[in-house]
A protein has these predicted regions:
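Short amphipathic alpha-helical segments
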Residues: 14-16, 37-40, 103-104, 125-127
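Cap/insert and terminal regions of metallo-dependent hydrolase folds
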Residues: 100-175
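Active-site metal-binding loops of divalent metal-dependent hydrolases
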Residues: 6, 30, 70-73, 93-97, ...
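Active-site neighborhood of divalent metal-dependent phosphoester bond hydrolases
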Residues: 31-51
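Active-site metal-binding motif and surrounding structural segment of the metallo-beta-lactamase
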Residues: 1-28
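Short, surface-exposed connector motifs at secondary-structure boundaries
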Residues: 18-22, 85-87, 158-164
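Core dinuclear metal-dependent hydrolase active-site scaffold
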Residues: 52-111
Length: 175
């Protein structure tokens, strides 16, 4: 299991998977601290956790895996770049904007999993309180459909084969 950040919707089961099922949980030291502080963690991580350093590749059998920083309002948020047999997968969810570092990892991808969280009009007109709308639209919130589309339109590479959009809001999107 590779953890991107310490928000409840991403970590609820990692304690059980790691400690009870003996599945290694890979994360940064700071994300691990955030996980163990979280109210939603009934099973804290201890023996199953494996630490990653951002932008330092690790090998897991034939997989070369590298984490990298992405802007979001959790603790020490990361995306992942995974390479096997010359094919590169970049995974970025829960990010408020695409930084130069994130763009670099996207440019390496043959297969890209990228957030397109919300439609701006649906979010603005929807039932969320204003503070939550502002959080979502912030530079450490989430990517809008249009921001994701604009980035992709300007940055498609010849070697990019597939794109999957992820973290689509059920309340503020119409995929």
């Amino acid at each position: 299991v590779f953890v991107t950040h310490d928000h409840a919707d991403h970590i609820k089961a990692v304690g059980h998977l790691g400690e009870k099922m003996n599945i290694p949980v890979y994360t940064t030291a700071r994300i691990h601290e955030g996980i163990n502080r979280s109210y939603c963690m009934t099973e804290k991580l201890s023996t199953s956790v494996r630490y990653l350093e951002k932008q330092v590749p690790m090998m897991l059998e034939d997989f070369r895996i590298e984490s990298f920083e992405v802007p979001h309002d959790g603790t020490d948020n990361v995306g992942y770049c995974i390479e096997i047999d010359g094919k590169v997968f970049s995974f970025l969810t829960d990010l408020g904007e695409i930084t130069p570092t994130a763009a670099d990892y996207i440019s390496k991808a043959n297969y890209l999993i990228l957030e397109a969280n919300y439609d701006e009009e649906m979010l603005k007109m929807g039932p969320y309180p204003q503070y939550l709308k502002e959080r979502i639209m912030s530079r450490t919130g989430h990517m809008s459909n249009s921001a994701t589309a604009e980035f992709l339109a300007e940055n498609i590479t010849e070697h990019l084969r597939y794109i999957w959009l992820c973290h689509l809001s059920k309340d503020n999107n119409h995929p």
